Structures are given as C-alpha cells and as structure tokens.
Amino acid sequence: MNATMQRSAVAGRTSGKVATTARASSMARPRLPIAGRVARRSAVTVRAVAEPVVVDKAVEAPAKPVPSGGDPWEDEKWTKYKWTVYRGVAYDLTPYLDRHPGGRWLLNLAIGRDATALFESYHLRPEVAASMLKRLPVLADFPVDAVPPSPRPNDSELYNAIRERVRKEVFKGTEIKGAHRSGSEGAAFAVLGYAAAMYALYTYDANPLTGALLGLGGAWIGLTIQHCGNHGAMSTNPVVNNLMGLTNDLAGGSSLMWRYHHQVSHHIHCNDDALDEDVFSAFPMLRFDDRLPKAWYHQFQHVYMWALFPFLQLVFQIGDWQALLTNRTVGATLYGASNFERQTLIAGKLAHYFLLYGLPAFLHGPTAMLGGAAGYLFTQSIVLAATFAVSHNVPETKPLDPGPTRENLDESAVTRDWGVQQVLTSANWGGVIGNFFTGGLNLQIEHHLFPAISFMHYPAISKIVADECKQRGIPYSHYDTLPEILGRFVRYMKEVGAAPQKPVKRDGEMLMLSKF
C-alpha cells in the first residue's frame, strides 16, 4: 500500500477531493437510480475465465420472502438484514455473525457489499466456506444488480493452481486444523517485548532518542502483529487476532479503519486507479500513478516526499477521525462497522494519546514530552512510509509503458484475472530475515495472494508462486535487498512525476464508487 499519505488531510477524506481525477470523480457524482446502475454494469466486457473451484452442494435454507427492488443500503426492507453478496446471490449473515470461526469483526467487512473476493482470498479451503455460506438464508428478489460487483479469485487458473500446491506441499492437509494461521508466535513475543522495553525507557527519560527507539517499536507493530492480526492470520483464536490487531490503536493507528482501507479497498483491487485508495489518497500532493493528472510540482516529488513522510502518523490521526465522522475511508464505506468497533476506536485513540503524550508530560514536563513524541512520530512514519511504499510503486508493478501489467489493469475490476493482478502489481525484496522484521510485507506477492496465512509460511510459498508464474510466463518481481528496491522506488517516483497522464482504457464502468 502507499501508506505514505494514505489518509492525507490534503488529499481529503471525502470523495469530492479525490474528484480531481477523471476516474475518482465518480465518487462525487449523485447516486444513480437502479436502472442506471444496471445499464452501466451491462457495458462491462466479458471474457473467458478459468473453471471456478467446485463447491460441494449444501442444503440451502429457504429464501426469505421480501419485496423486490429498492435500494439495499437505504430501504428498510433491506437495511434490517446484515446482507452480503457472493457470486450473484444475496445472503443474510445475521445467523452466522457470532459463530464465524474468524470472529465477527472480520465477517463485518462483508456486510453491505459483494464480498466474493474477500471470501475466496481469505479461505485456503474456499469450498468449505462457500458450503457454509449456502446454509444461510437467501434474500429472494434482492437487487443484486445495484451492488458493485466483486472480482472472483476462484476464476483465476493461476490462483487455483498455486493454492492447490500450497495446500499439498506446504501444509499437507494441516490447514484443516488451522495450521496456516499459526507460526508467528515467536515474532509476536519479540515485537511486544521490544515495544514494552522501549516504552519503559521512554517513560523513564522522554527525549528524541528514546522517542525514536519507541517509534521503531511502533513501526514494527504496524508492520507485523497488527497487520497479521487484522488479517486474522496470527492465530486460530479470533480473540488473539483481534487483540493483536488492536495494537494498531495503541501505536497510533486504527484497526477498524485499517481493515476497511487495507483489506476491502487495497487488497481486493491492488493498484486499481479508481478502487485502491492507496493509489489516489495521497493525491494531489504525491502522484503515485501516471493515470492521475499531472501538476508541475510532481516532477520534484521524489525530493519533497521525504519532507512529507515524517508526518504520516499525524495524517493517520486526522484521517481516522474524519472516517469515523463520515462513515467512510477514502476507498471503502464502513457498512458493517459495529458501534462497539467505533467505541473501540475512540478508546484506542485516547489510550494512545495518554501513553505518548499524557504520561510523559506528567512525569517529565511538556518540553521533554514534545521532544520524545516528535522522535516517535517521525521515526515511525518514515519507517512505515518507506517500507509500505516500495511494494507497489516500482516500474514492474506500475509500468509507464504498455505491457502485461497495464493490460491487466486496463480491464474492468470484475473481469480481470485477480490472481494475475496480485502478482503483477506487487514486488518482493529480501528473504527470511526481511520476512521476520516486516511481517511478510517484503514478500508482498505471497501476502496479497494469501492475506490470511501467517507470514512465517511465505518463504516456502514464494517458491511455489515463482514456479507457477515461470511456467506461464507471468513476470514475478523480486529485488535482493531493501536498499535496492527503495532506490528503484525513488527513481520511479521521479519518472512518474514527470510522465504525461495516461488515459484509462476500460470498456465500460462497472460500479458507482460512492457505494463501494
């Protein structure tokens, strides 16, 4: 993700600000009537796809008799349900929310949207998840055509082949018992131990140095345990995953906003200029993509971005509060967010402010606190910005010239090959050591294909992914070290800052962004 300015106050939390681009301007348009949405949907080009994963037949619950038509987000006949759409069928999730093995907080992400890609990319055995879904009440006459459609990972021949080999060669059947969600416990203890020790040092003597050391701990939390926990990949116990995810709040972020921004928007639509908020949320300050309009100052962004990166943490704060008030991150609406989750956000913010500002000010005075807090904010921000930004912002993942990556992204989000998209739009660097310190974010390709698998398994999975891509002639991007990919990122930012705007070549639009 472009964590660099993901919730920029300058770029704006509202869709109107993003409307400076032709693609994102859809977010500011009035909501289309149902008939209009259907007409837009019909313009999508259809292409042949791989045979989807076979799902065992399950006994389906009788459809609920409800009136036809209506707006599923506003009409009472639909809003009383916790509805989701999977492969063209609407289901009521209410009976299953508290029984979901991954926890209700994860299933909430599916409410109010087509969650096909979420379901299929989060389950190593998607046939089991689909079978359970088919036991839920079906909402008859639900206006499915009014819901922005989701990509379908199971229709990707590449993704199916990789997943099958991962199940057989890496987990050998143990995924049935949840082995794929474990293995990172040692890393969690290391991260928490370091963060606790640095906080003790910070409260003992608050100054820029101890603040910077604590900032490294905050960044390490952001890269590893909160990230893995919010994906439900730290443990087979959803409570553990939730607690690890909440460390994001203590470190200064928001686990709730992260899940919608990162998992609903970025992961499903990686590097899509209209649907991945990491592409456009820093605009107009930073231009991460040549499909965005070009301003004169973008030619210098590879220089001045380093003056912006230290303020990423402050951007998080502004963006999280704005999203809470507007019920929307830049790229995803909080349809399923519960009142408890919202209250947790507020409590987490207050706890963070007390730990970083309140207690040190009480112990050492405001001057010492400000110096220490500045060290924390700047260090955490720079580490997160630099580490996250390189994964999707190099020439291989966002080429300025024609090629397979641009061809894939020029298709509509619904019809493009989802598995191929994740490979083409992500880049890896380093190996096992980088995997430990970044929570698997250095192996970004594997993380995007399997977000719900513990990062400790990514090195083994990467060999399978590289082999399957080689067999099909699909580019697989890997840099040897972080400095190497970081240097290429800087050069890319210079190149894209000077590049002319490229039109988006898509045959038709498939959704109203304001309802995504």
UniProtKB/Swiss-Prot annotation:
Residues 83-148 form the Cytochrome b5 heme-binding domain. Residues 1-47 form a transit peptide. This is Acyl-lipid (7-3)-desaturase, chloroplastic. Residues 1-25 are annotated as: Disordered. Fatty acid desaturase that introduces a cis double bond at the 4-position in 16-carbon polyunsaturated fatty acids that contain a Delta(7) double bond, resulting in the production of 16 carbon fatty acid (7Z,10Z,13Z)-hexadeca-7,10,13-trienoate. It comes from Chlamydomonas reinhardtii (Chlamydomonas smithii). CDD domains: Delta6-FADS-like. Its cofactor is Fe(2+). It catalyses: a (7Z,10Z,13Z,16Z,19Z)-docosapentaenoyl-containing glycerolipid + 2 Fe(II)-[cytochrome b5] + O2 + 2 H(+) = a (4Z,7Z,10Z,13Z,16Z,19Z)-docosahexaenoyl-containing glycerolipid + 2 Fe(III)-[cytochrome b5] + 2 H2O; a (7Z,10Z,13Z,16Z)-docosatetraenoyl-containing glycerolipid + 2 Fe(II)-[cytochrome b5] + O2 + 2 H(+) = a (4Z,7Z,10Z,13Z,16Z)-docosapentaenoyl-containing glycerolipid + 2 Fe(III)-[cytochrome b5] + 2 H2O. Its EC number is 1.14.19.31. It is found in: Plastid, Chloroplast membrane.
